[in-house]
């Protein structure tokens, strides 16, 4: 998911 990208990165 898009939000997951910013959350992990």
From Swiss-Prot:
Pfam families named among the record's database cross-references: Bombesin (PF02044)
Subcellular location: Secreted
InterPro entries for the chain: Bombesin (IPR000874)
Assigned keywords, A-Z: Amidation, Amphibian defense peptide, Pyrrolidone carboxylic acid, Secreted
One of the GO biological process terms: neuropeptide signaling pathway
Tissues expressed in: Expressed by the skin glands.
PTM annotation (Pyrrolidone carboxylic acid): residues: 1
Secreted found in the keyword field: yes
Main localization (coarse): secreted
PROSITE patterns from the UniProt entry: BOMBESIN
Listed GO CC annotations: extracellular region
Modified positions (Methionine amide) in chain numbering: 9
Family: Belongs to the bombesin/neuromedin-B/ranatensin family.
Protein name as annotated: Rhodei-litorin
Organism of origin: Pithecopus rohdei
């Amino acid at each position: 998911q898009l939000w997951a990208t910013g959350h992990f990165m």
